[in-house]
């Protein structure tokens, strides 16, 4: 099993080209099931989760061909299987997004109850609720969610019980082929939902309101083919900006969207960073100074993203002063904290809050990644710690960061991927 070996400390400075968004690419890939015509997707990142998604789609009968450097041709005309099996779904919760398109286009579909990062309970209840409102019959048996409908799904007025990115994407995609109008309220507003809606509209869907708390979908009978470029990854952008902040360096992120990161940029500015933005770039300069501790509360977009919480925990750990981070989206999302304590962090967890008392420096240690974003914080910690840090279980980071060690090396990090003990 591979691991990272990192020699610190170092100041990270330079330019980073941001990859396509994992959190947009996954629902868009699953949404290709809605069309029987060829689709070209561009700016697709090379990630483990993308590979898993393509393997799942191929098992359903989808033809997928990679075209360097970052495009994939998708043809879902000959789908002849309607079940997403446990072997693939267990590694990635996003597989639930196959269910809506399958039942919308083919009248049936089944997906194994999902797996993925071990971050608390991410129930599928809201996905099921939304599909039922559209007329789908749902059964849960033998570890599978089975959905079916006679004829087409029917448009409905749906008020989601809770703001959920995943459920919003499921219901919105299924509603594109439903008969009539669907009004979906209390939906998530994340940019990745807007990107998915824009993609579906390119194919002939009629979706309005994505990015607000109410989405209106006028159902159509079929979707055509087309070409679409995935949005840049705002979480990868934020991660590399934090890399510059915690190492007292200067980092420029290119091919990104500053407007999707306003909450993160505000906190980085509060931490003492000099921030400049252009149309598709963001510059962060710490002028060689330690960051100042900040208080953060994760909330749905446009609030501070839960996927940046672990990185800001690290920022507070090496900042001047004391910072409090409150996690309101997922429970059990502080699994990186005990690992950072091994490196010298002064941190206290109280329920869904982590209190960080800043220290001057961390010490290298052997640590273990527990989930995608936590693994990123551990890698960055290794870059700024005194001595050698090894990060185990880096398959977590490969799920969501494209060539992270190569990008960090270009910024001045001493990091290598090595073979660990079996």
Swiss-Prot record:
The record lists the catalysed reaction(s) as:
phosphoenolpyruvate + UDP-N-acetyl-alpha-D-glucosamine = UDP-N-acetyl-3-O-(1-carboxyvinyl)-alpha-D-glucosamine + phosphate
Q: Which residues carry this modification: 2-(S-cysteinyl)pyruvic acid O-phosphothioketal?
A: 117
* Positions of phosphoenolpyruvate binding: 22-23
What InterPro entries does the annotation carry?
A: Enolpyruvate_Tfrase_dom, Enolpyruvate_Tfrase_sf, MurA_subfamily, RNA3'P_cycl/enolpyr_Trfase_a/b, UDP_GlcNAc_COvinyl_MurA
Its Gene Ontology cellular component terms are: cytoplasm
Where, subcellularly, is it found? Cytoplasm
Where does the record place the catalytic residues?
117
Annotated positions binding UDP-N-acetyl-alpha-D-glucosamine: 93, 122-126, 162-165, 307, 329
User: Which UniProt keywords are listed?
Assistant: Cell cycle, Cell division, Cell shape, Cell wall biogenesis/degradation, Cytoplasm, Peptidoglycan synthesis, Pyruvate, Transferase
Broadest EC class assigned to this enzyme: transferase
Might you give the EC number(s) for this enzyme?
Answer: 2.5.1.7
Pathway listed: Cell wall biogenesis; peptidoglycan biosynthesis
Any one GO MF annotation of this record:
UDP-N-acetylglucosamine 1-carboxyvinyltransferase activity
Query: Which family does the entry's similarity section mention?
Result: Belongs to the EPSP synthase family. MurA subfamily.
Q: What does this protein do?
A: Cell wall formation. Adds enolpyruvyl to UDP-N-acetylglucosamine.
Name of this chain's protein: UDP-N-acetylglucosamine 1-carboxyvinyltransferase
């Amino acid at each position: 099993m591979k691991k990272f070996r990192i020699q610190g400390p170092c100041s990270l400075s330079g330019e980073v080209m941001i990859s396509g968004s994992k959190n947009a690419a996954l629902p868009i890939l699953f949404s290709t099931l809605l069309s029987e015509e060829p689709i070209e997707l561009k700016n697709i990142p090379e990630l483990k989760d993308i590979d898993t998604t393509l393997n799942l789609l191929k098992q359903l009968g989808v033809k997928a061909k990679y075209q360097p450097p970052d495009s994939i041709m998708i043809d879902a005309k000959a789908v002849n299987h309607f079940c997403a099996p446990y072997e693939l779904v267990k590694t990635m919760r996003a597989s639930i997004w196959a269910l809506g398109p399958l039942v919308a286009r083919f009248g049936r579909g089944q997906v194994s109850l999902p797996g993925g990062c071990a971050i608390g309970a991410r129930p599928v209840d809201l996905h099921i609720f939304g599909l039922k409102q559209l007329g789908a019959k749902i059964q849960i048996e033998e570890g599978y969610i089975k959905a079916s409908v006679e004829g087409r799904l029917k448009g409905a007025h749906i008020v989601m019980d809770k703001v959920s990115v995943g459920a919003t994407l499921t219901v919105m995609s299924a509603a594109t082929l439903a008969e009539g109008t669907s009004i979906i309220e209390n939906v998530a507003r994340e940019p990745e939902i807007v990107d998915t809606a824009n993609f579906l509209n390119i194919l002939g869907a009629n979706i309005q309101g994505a990015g607000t708390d109410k989405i209106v979908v006028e159902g159509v009978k079929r979707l055509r083919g087309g070409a679409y470029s995935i949005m840049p990854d705002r979480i990868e952008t934020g991660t590399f900006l934090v890399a510059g902040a915690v190492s007292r360096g200067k980092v420029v992120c290119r091919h990104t969207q500053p407007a999707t990161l306003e909450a993160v940029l505000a906190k980085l500015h509060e931490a003492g960073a000099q921030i400049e933005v252009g149309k598709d770039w963001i510059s962060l300069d710490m002028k060689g100074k330690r960051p100042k501790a900040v208080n953060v509360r994760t909330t749905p977009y446009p609030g501070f993203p839960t996927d940046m919480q672990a990185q800001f925990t690290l920022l507070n750990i090496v900042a001047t002063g004391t910072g409090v981070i409150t996690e309101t989206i997922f429970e059990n999302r502080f699994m990186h904290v005990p690992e950072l304590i091994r490196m010298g962090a002064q941190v206290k967890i109280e329920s869904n809050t982590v209190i960080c008392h800043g220290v001057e420096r961390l010490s290298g240690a052997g640590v273990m990644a527990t989930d995608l974003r936590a693994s990123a914080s551990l890698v960055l910690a290794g870059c700024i710690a005194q001595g050698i840090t090894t990060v185990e279980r880096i398959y977590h980071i490969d799920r969501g960061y494209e060539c992270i060690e190569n990008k960090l090396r270009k910024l001045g990090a001493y990091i290598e991927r090595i073979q660990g003990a079996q």
